[in-house]
A protein has these predicted regions:
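C-terminal structured domain segments
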Residues: 278-280
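Beta-rich carbohydrate-recognition and catalytic domains
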Residues: 1-23, 31-78, 85-274, 283-311
Length: 311
């Protein structure tokens, strides 16, 4: 699935700040849809404030951006929007709706759109207290990994044939070390790969692999701590991860994942620091486009980077 013998190099060729109108702009995702770019992220007072809304920006060229919409729910903190490209041509958005002043409760919600600008009303999906982080379609079904937001901690795999009615597929996908955020991709041969963040014990990330019907998973400890993981498989089979790395200076970075060797290797660090992470990855016009957020320039803002790969 990958080409580990080829030495890859990467260079950040451009970086633009595209989201900075709120005191705290963060938790991004990126997609190309109907010939346009769309970038979604949360706007709020702070990282953990209870006033989060989802801003969706759009662009034709990735350089000049305008607001497509703002999604808000009264009395609710909307967090971590994630795009899902659907086989029926619609664009889907997943997020968590957090409520409660002292003890927060989390419910995954979703919206659907035919143009990326107008979005239907929110629909609750999955189960209360299990945050469906990312989802991807394969062979007429959508799969999403959710994680428990309170004890007992676990990760769970869901399956849906319409992207809305999420059914438990693997109730206990992973349990040890407080598993939570994840990236999920499918190879052309149907193999599923899941990059899973953990925040307890050794806190080392796990790489899961499964073949259809995705009931049985094998896991490899990658030996490195990551945050905000996402996965992208390039046309040549190279598997990339966008993550926050904690060794040395905290940074958002692009890494190569070798599933056979169980290795995650940093390829290039993006201009970032402090409160930073949650990249979105898109391969377009032979470039890797990366949305992410960072506070290295002071206020926490959203950036778009272009990364060229050689080798």
């Amino acid at each position: 699935m990958t080409s580990p013998t080829r030495r890859r190099t990467a260079e950040v060729t451009a970086v633009r700040r595209i989201g900075d109108s709120a005191p705290h702009s963060a938790f991004t995702d990126l997609v190309r849809y109907s010939g346009r770019w769309f970038c979604a992220f949360r706007e709020a007072r702070t990282h953990l404030s209870d006033d989060g809304v989802i801003r969706v920006l759009t662009s034709t060229d990735g350089r000049s951006w305008t607001s497509a919409t703002v999604i808000a729910q009264a009395g609710t903190d909307l967090r971590d929007p994630r795009f899902v490209a659907r086989p029926d041509g619609r664009l889907q958005l997943l997020a968590a709706a957090a409520t409660g002043a002292v003890t927060k409760t989390f419910q995954t919600v979703t919206w659907l759109s035919t143009d990326g600008h107008a979005w239907g009303g929110p629909t609750q999906v999955g189960e209360p207290g299990v945050w469906v982080w990312r989802a991807a379609w394969h062979d007429d079904a959508m799969y999403g990994v959710g994680y428990a937001t309170r004890e007992p901690r676990f990760a769970r795999l869901y399956r849906s044939t319409d992207g809305v009615d999420l059914r438990q597929w693997v109730p206990m996908l992973f349990e040890d070390g407080y598993p939570n955020e994840s990236g999920l991709v499918f190879a052309p041969d149907g193999t599923a790969l899941c990059l899973l963040r953990r925040d307890a014990g050794t806190a080392s990330a796990q790489l899961g692999r499964a073949v259809p019907p995705y009931r049985d998973w094998t896991w490899t400890d990658l030996g490195v701590q990551v945050g905000g993981p996402t996965l992208l498989r390039l046309p040549d089979g190279l598997l990339l991860a966008g993550v926050r790395l904690h060794d040395g200076e905290v940074r958002t970075a692009i890494c190569v994942v070798d599933p056979d060797r169980g290795e995650l290797t940093e390829l290039v660090a993006l201009p970032s620091g402090g409160d930073t992470s949650y990249p979105g990855l898109v391969w377009h016009d032979d470039l890797l486009w990366v949305s992410y957020y960072s506070s290295h320039e002071g206020r926490t803002c959203v950036y778009l980077a272009e990364v060229s790969l050689t080798g």
